[in-house]
Amino acid sequence: MKDNFSFAATSRNITSSRPFDNLNATGTNESAFNCSHKPSDKHLEAIPVLYYMIFVIGFAVNIVVVSLFCCQKGPKKVSSIYIFNLALADLLLLATLPLWATYYSYRYDWLFGPVMCKVFGSFLTLNMFASIFFITCMSVDRYQSVIYPFLSQRRNPWQASYVVPLVWCMACLSSLPTFYFRDVRTIEYLGVNACIMAFPPEKYAQWSAGIALMKNILGFIIPLIFIATCYFGIRKHLLKTNSYGKNRITRDQVLKMAAAVVLAFIICWLPFHVLTFLDALTWMGIINSCEVIAVIDLALPFAILLGFTNSCVNPFLYCFVGNRFQQKLRSVFRVPITWLQGKRETMSCRKGSSLREMDTFVS
């Protein structure tokens, strides 16, 4: 182990693949870790606290979503099924945060053994992809509801029963490299047993760059293309609709929600994927700047943290803003929800079919 590595570098191995052993193996990019920087790890002291905060808030709001779905009587809507699975993926992702908070608290010393390292590392990756994939499904579903309202009215819940297993299978496949390579390795210089991606030494750089680019493409670029295309298509369609009075208010609400969904996804995940892409470039030898590597090491823990906050935001974007959320909450818990009371605009029964379908955004 070379003596120029800092604690911060180990953070890449929570969702990334910077190695901490076998650094002299052939096939690696020596310039990526020949830097002499050793930034302070003082900033890591705040990470566990922030992880626990996200865990508590995110777990609470997603539990409410899951409870509403499980207690809902009658047939389930396609959009409700997607929201339930999104909340479930977020819950499972958030459930891993206490372990990673402990990992940070002990300066990357994994205390839970190699099996838990492999299982929870894979669990985190699987549900991260599942959450992003279900956000994409929600975007496509809402696009269909607004652009093709008559066809969407004929949708049956059983149609979602095909999509949901497919999404979970895709998430499982995306997490297979993590399940295969994640393991505990002793880092003598740091005096820790780190939970890392233990790629073959002779191909470490290639594997690290490949996995990083895979996460960029499957976890951000492709979903963002779908999400942005769907919501800008909705915006274009609704702006062509002549709406007045309450219909216009509803239309404006939908447009704001469309923008909020796109912005939330970008704000939460763009920093992580930019740093992951830069990390891939260092492994490929395209970037050899020690300053860039230092920035990646310093910023990545907070970028990962920001990505996890998306799991806290999702219930507010897809469930809590609904016109019927207060009524659903009352029917399930049978208590007055005075803190949720506010002005609710009732849509006209004579509005166009496209505007009727906009209720899928706020229901």
Swiss-Prot record:
The residue ranges crossing the membrane are 46-70, 81-104, 115-140, 160-181, 207-232, 258-281, 295-320
Glycosylated positions are N4, N13, N24, N29, N34
Q: Give GO cellular component annotations, separated by semicolons.
A: plasma membrane
Ranges for region Helix VIII: 324-333
Q: What does this protein do?
A: Receptor for angiotensin II, a vasoconstricting peptide. Signals primarily via a non-canonical G-protein- and beta-arrestin independent pathways. Cooperates with MTUS1 to inhibit ERK2 activation and cell proliferation.
Family according to the record? Belongs to the G-protein coupled receptor 1 family.
Oligomer and partners = Interacts with MTUS1.
- The protein in question is named Type-2 angiotensin II receptor
Q: Which species is the source of this protein?
A: Mus musculus
